[in-house]
From Swiss-Prot:
It comes from Pongo abelii. The modification N-acetylalanine is found at residue 2. This is Nucleoplasmin-3. Plays a role in the regulation of diverse cellular processes such as ribosome biogenesis, chromatin remodeling or protein chaperoning. Modulates the histone chaperone function and the RNA-binding activity of nucleolar phosphoprotein B23/NPM. Efficiently mediates chromatin remodeling when included in a pentamer containing NPM3 and NPM. One of its GO terms (cellular component) is actin cytoskeleton. One of its GO terms (biological process) is chromatin remodeling. InterPro entries: Nucleoplasmin, Nucleoplasmin_core_dom, Nucleoplasmin_core_dom_sf.
Length: 180
């Protein structure tokens, strides 16, 4: 590979990393981790409400994404109204009915990842159930700590970038005498 080509490739490599935010003293955003866990609860004549809470001390962002509500074995052919109690944009508690299930006409309802911020309370407002509520508990964590291993890798990367940048300059070709 010619020295000029190597210099051009080193420049392009350096330029693309700079635009991506990873070189030249630019701050790289904190790594984000996302975990997802199954969620489920059952409301019935014996258990008429369930509250989903998370620890307040936790710095992570929690989301409860509801996927489905369905009547389970032993349900009577009656209206089962499920209500969700949560907080609105003004942090005021509100109660909203989200499903009216009946065994003979609508035994289940898909909620298509209906997202709620905890704490959330589910109440069986009418009917005797049992009503099964399913979904996913999603936890998004932003890591502020950069491990020593990552710091060392970044330093090694910067050192190799500096070495690539210190390529020899392109010199003009020597004239060869005697050729017409």
């Amino acid at each position: 590979m010619a020295a000029g080509t190597a210099a051009a490739l080193a420049f392009l490599s350096q330029e693309s990393r700079t635009r991506a935010g990873g070189v030249g003293g630019l701050r790289v955003p904190a790594p984000v981790t996302m975990d997802s866990f199954f969620f489920g609860c059952e409301l019935s004549g014996h258990t008429r409400s369930f509250t989903f809470k998370v620890e307040e001390e936790d710095d992570a962002e929690h989301v409860l994404a509801l996927t489905m509500l369905c009547l389970t074995e032993g349900a009577k052919d009656e209206c089962n109204v499920v209500e969700v109690v949560a907080r609105n944009h003004d942090h005021q508690e509100i109660a909203v009915p989200v499903a009216n299930l009946k065994l003979s006409c609508q035994p289940m309802l898909s909620l298509d990842d209906f997202q709620l911020q905890p704490p959330v309370t589910f109440r069986l407002k009418s009917g005797s159930g049992p009503v099964r509520i399913t979904g996913r508990h999603q936890i998004v964590t932003m890591s502020n700590d950069v491990s020593e291993e990552e710091s060392e890798e970044e330093e090694e990367e910067e050192d190799s970038d500096e070495e690539e940048a210190e390529l020899c300059p392109i010199l003009p070709a020597k004239k060869q005498g005697g050729r017409p």
